Amino acid sequence: MSSFGKVAVLFGGTSAEREVSLNSGSRVLAALQGQGIDAHAFDPAEQPLDALKGYDRAFIALHGRHGEDGTIQGALEVMHIPYTGSGVLASALAMDKFRTKLMWRAAGLAIPEYALLTADSDFADIEEELGLPLFVKPAREGSSIGVTKVKERGALKAAYEEAARHDPLVIAEKGVMGGEYTVGIIGDEAMPIIKIEPATEWYDYEAKYNRDDTRYLCPCGLPEAKEMEIRKGALEAFRILGGRGWGRVDFLMDEDGKYYFLEVNTAPGMTDHSLVPMAARVNGMDYPTLVRRVLELAAND
């Protein structure tokens, strides 16, 4: 019997990212069980949360709403079960791209210019103000679900309507076209940066999960001093939201080398296409060791 006791691996759930979560969770479960840990699958869509009583720890491999937005974290707090990843407030903030931006801007971090959209927005004015291309996003979804790249004038309203199908809170974000990068965080350490080069026009759901021609560069090609500066900044961005345990910070870089923080993922994917396992591997940590380390960092607020 391991020192972790009885471990629930939470995956599946009811969000739009259920399929990704099932993939992540099944791999996490196998990695834990392969190390002799008493780990069990737990799908909140199929089992009542009361059934978690008697578990000693929880590994959260849920993605999206009710999984990384503070909801399941609050339930685990009430049951006094230590869990992986960030606490209630940090999870809720990070899931909300709009409020993440408010926090980061107040702290002086660089972020892409953006606007909140409603059905009554002057879409032509916003296109003019932000310029094209821009990205329209549901503020509280992940995996690029509901996201549209707007390249032509007059297309913003339709993009808003698509995003609003997923979330009434919608943002339009100025496109930063120099490159997309991500920084995995484990404990107090920022992992090596990964540069993402999708074969598609941008890093959408298809490129993230279903294609094998997306390129992931690690080392990312940035000068060492620049990489260390950004890794330090990513830790700061994570901590400003109250992040703990592990996570992932995404950022964009423009053609002049200026970087802009984009969002935080507090329950990163653990699939065979996922980014934190890639960075950990470059850092000398294989998948089972990574999963065990994340579980070691489980805590309560």
From Swiss-Prot:
Keywords linked to the UniProt accession: ATP-binding, Cell shape, Cell wall biogenesis/degradation, Cytoplasm, Ligase, Magnesium, Manganese, Metal-binding, Nucleotide-binding, Peptidoglycan synthesis
Cofactor annotation remark: Binds 2 magnesium or manganese ions per subunit.
GO BP terms: cell wall organization; peptidoglycan biosynthetic process; regulation of cell shape
Recorded superkingdom: Bacteria
Cited function: Cell wall formation.
Family membership: Belongs to the D-alanine--D-alanine ligase family.
Protein name: D-alanine--D-alanine ligase
Organism name: Dechloromonas aromatica (strain RCB)
